[in-house]
A protein has these predicted regions:
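Extended alpha-helical targeting/anchoring segments
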Residues: 74, 78-104
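Acidic, low-complexity central loop/insert segments
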Residues: 15-68
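Single conserved hydrophobic/aromatic residue that forms the stacking wall/gate
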Residues: 1-7, 12
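Residue-level signal for inorganic ion chemistry
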Residues: 4, 25, 80, 130, ...
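The conserved catalytic core of RNA pseudouridine synthases
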Residues: 92-124, 128-139
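A structural signal for short, well-ordered beta-strand segments
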Residues: 25-27, 105, 117, 147
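Accessory RNA 3′-end/elbow-binding domains used by RNA modification enzymes
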Residues: 19, 53, 137, 141-226
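Flexible, glycine/proline-enriched loop segments at strand-loop-helix junctions
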Residues: 40-50, 72-74, 92, 117-118
Length: 226
């Protein structure tokens, strides 16, 4: 699932980028690669001897705030160069760990060496790194076999359209009926009612001052989205 913004809706792109994500992933135990997924060069292989209970405990131990070291094969930039560009040149540099949050994990199936699970997480979480870290914790290594993003913010994959469906809607003249209003991005947040005289300032992206507020339903913390 990937969002598609049109026209003035591009201004909320950063908000979607900051949204939590949900994924369905399959990992393979007993194997590691240089990319942490099935497309990379195999680095190690070993027999998987851990039990299902040990696997479950290891996976669930990652729920909450954790530190992750971004993989070399990623689009993060260092000194203007993307890490994956450096990795392809055989260059590996030190990456600082980052704090991410795993909100929940549900283990769907264990059919060794494969484990399928769903995960909800904060922005900036690398699921293939999570798979690799799970393998490290179990002592046998692991890689990510497959990944599907199933939710972005409040938008589930069930509401997504395939490109072929979009093309058909365009031909039939019904595409606008399926376009979601940008307000939907903010449905998960508390609302503030502003006075009419603040409309122009807000539409131009300016700050809202307390004297321009008509109604507030709760007290907000510094930095909280509304």
């Amino acid at each position: 699932i990937s969002e598609c913004l049109v026209g003035s809706e591009m201004c909320i792109r950063d908000r979607l980028t900051l949204s939590d994500k949900c994924y369905r992933a399959e990992l393979v135990l007993g194997m590691t690669t240089d990319t942490q997924d099935a497309d990379g060069e195999v680095l190690t292989e070993c027999e998987v001897t851990c039990s299902e209970d040990e696997i479950r405990q290891a996976i669930m131990s990652f729920v909450g705030e954790i530190e992750q070291i971004p993989p070399m094969y990623s689009a993060l930039k260092v000194n203007g160069k993307k890490l994956y560009e450096l990795a392809r040149q055989g260059v590996e540099i030190e990456r600082k760990p980052r704090i991410v949050e795993i909100h929940h994990i549900r283990i769907e199936e264990i059919a060794l060496p494969y484990v399928t699970f769903t995960v909800g997480c904060s922005k900036g979480t690398y699921i293939r790194t999570l798979c690799a870290d799970i393998g490290d914790k179990l002592g046998c290594g692991a890689l990510m076999e497959s990944l599907v993003r199933t939710r972005v913010g409040t938008f589930p994959i069930e509401e997504a359209l395939k490109l072929s469906q979009v093309e058909e809607l365009v031909r039939e003249g019904h595409l606008e009926e399926r376009v979601i209003a940008p307000d939907a991005v903010f449905e998960e947040y508390e609302a503030i009612t502003a006075l009419p005289e603040a409309d122009k300032a807000l539409s131009n992206g300016n700050k809202l001052y307390f004297g321009q507020v008509r109604a507030v339903r709760k007290r907000f913390a510094d930095g909280e989205w509304v």
